[in-house]
Amino acid sequence: MTKVVVGLSGGVDSAVAAFLLKKQGYLVEAVFMRNWDSNLNFDIQGNPTLNDICSQELDYKDSLKVSEQLGIKLHRVDFIEEYWQKVFMSFIKAFENNLTPNPDILCNNEIKFRAFIEYATTKLAPQYIAMGHYANIIYETSSDQKLVPRLACAVDQNKDQTYFLSQLTTKQLQNILFPLGNLTKQEVRQIALENNLINATKKDSTGICFIGERNFFQFLSNYLPAQKGDIKTLDGTFLAHHKGVMYYTIGQRKNLGLGDVPSQKPWFVVGKHLPTNTLYVEQGSTHPYLYSDKALIGDIVWRGKKTNLHLQAKMRYRQPNQDVILTWLDQNNLEIHYPQTIKAVTPGQICAFYDKNICCGAGVIKEVYFQGTKRLYT
């Protein structure tokens, strides 16, 4: 029998993925990953589960029950050190540099599709690795007649997770299975219900990858001390004080502390200046300073040819694809141009590129411009 190792999280998606693989005749084994230790990692402020049973332990119990239901072996592995060093410290460093990172993408790059794969292939020797992501893999024949995996969008466009997988290398996609790629979320729930899986009605996980729900301001304060600074309008008018520019992101409306400032429209973050620790805000969700027409993208991971310079891009999860024109600067950096202008293109976030339903690659948004002038987004 062909052996598959599936990542089991305790949620319904990975449970149905394991169920489908077994139904298709694979020899299935599962692995549960533990990647965060609240006490060891000083996760105190903003942690609503600090005095309760750790949510990861509850997820592990659900994974055990699912594996027992399906009659598959469950392994448990800790990647706490790897997660801290490769994901979380990169996450914190980005905030220190006034960027807005995406921990889910870092987590996929370094843990789920690196540390996990290394563990599974070394210890369990499967032919395939499977995950419960909403994505697809298709294969193209290269010039030397080898089959090359390409990351393709899921059928369920609302749940498609290729954005979070967009920085994986071609090597990381080798021998990967995504059993849910051609199913909708509703169909996945229905399969779980029809087969009495214990977590069929369990709500989807939210929050930071493997950490969970947190009060974001308080959570970051465990690792980034508050740095009081000025909140100003673009013309320099002082409005109030903030807790530190790294706590805010471009386009943010809530938790600005401007409730006492008279205004006709809601305030939005339109700029951040780290050297002076100044947060810039303006009124209205369509303020011109929120828009840009060019961005510099770095740390590129690209899969396939670079010949097509007219692609679509996604600068945040679930954003409708945007038409962009690429100008390659070197192997690792490019500029994207979008004359139609796009709102809240945020340094630190990932820009994923698409050619129809194929995700070609992605990079980190470094700088943002409008009509040749750099926006004060960092």
Swiss-Prot record:
- A Pfam family recorded for this sequence: tRNA_Me_trans_C
Query: Where does the record place it?
Result: Cytoplasm
Kind of enzyme, top EC level? Answer: transferase
Reaction(s) catalysed by this chain, per the record, are: S-sulfanyl-L-cysteinyl-[protein] + uridine(34) in tRNA + AH2 + ATP = 2-thiouridine(34) in tRNA + L-cysteinyl-[protein] + A + AMP + diphosphate + H(+)
Q: Which GO terms describe its biological process?
A: tRNA wobble position uridine thiolation
Give GO terms: molecular function aspect only: ATP binding; tRNA binding; tRNA-uridine 2-sulfurtransferase activity
Site Interaction with tRNA: list residues.
Answer: H133, Q349
Mind naming one GO cellular-component term on file for this protein? Answer: cytoplasm
Question: Where is region (Interaction with target base in tRNA) located?
Answer: 102-104
Question: CDD domains of this UniProt entry?
Answer: MnmA_TRMU-like
Q: Which UniProt keywords apply?
A: ATP-binding, Cytoplasm, Disulfide bond, Nucleotide-binding, RNA-binding, Transferase, tRNA processing, tRNA-binding
Does the keyword section mention Ion transport? no
The family classification in the record reads: Belongs to the MnmA/TRMU family.
The role this protein plays is: Catalyzes the 2-thiolation of uridine at the wobble position (U34) of tRNA, leading to the formation of s(2)U34.
| Protein name per Swiss-Prot or TrEMBL | tRNA-specific 2-thiouridylase MnmA
Organism of derivation: Onion yellows phytoplasma (strain OY-M)
Q: Which gene encodes it?
A: mnmA
